[in-house]
Amino acid sequence: MDHAVSSLQYFFLILLCLSLLVCSNSDDGSKSRTKTILINFGDSNSDTGGVLAGSGLPIGLPHGITFFHRGTGRLGDGRLIVDFFCEHLKMTYLSPYLDSLSPNFKRGVNFAVSGATALPVFSFPLAVQIRQFVHFKNRSQELISSGRRDLIDDNGFKNALYMIDIGQNDLLLALYDSNLTYTSVVEKIPTMLAEIKKAIQTVYLYGGRN
């Protein structure tokens, strides 16, 4: 049991450290002459409309009622943490990667989809979001070489701020849908972290450094 508790504490310590790192990087980016580009992966904590575009599920009021005053695809009544990052960086809110209607990808892109998991048990798990990122980067480079100027270039991908906020749904599924013991749930955490590690390694392989 002590080992299980220490593993769970270690998991949340990693999440805290990553959050602090993102905050630090976002402050530096706001002072830089180069406009910060933000690329996000995750679940409902940072989904700005991915599940709406991807599934067609109607997500209307009361979602969005206190700030946007309309449904935006966010599963909440106002802004998300990623929205506050965008405001701090003086940039528009991130467009979902899956949104085909007038998206704006010049300052970033959001691959997050509500319900997403670190492990491959959902239609848009982290591994799929990473593959979408690879396609997005390759396609952006193709279009830029053809004359497009409204997309992220190679230098932009290199210097972009990358965020990954995922894992809560894995724990919820394990705790409430699988009838696992607490110890068994905690034992799944290293596998979840391995998926996040692979995602970070792929982002690095394709030029991401922050």
Regions found by a protein language model. Name each.
Residues 2-210:
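Conserved active-site regions of diverse hydrolases
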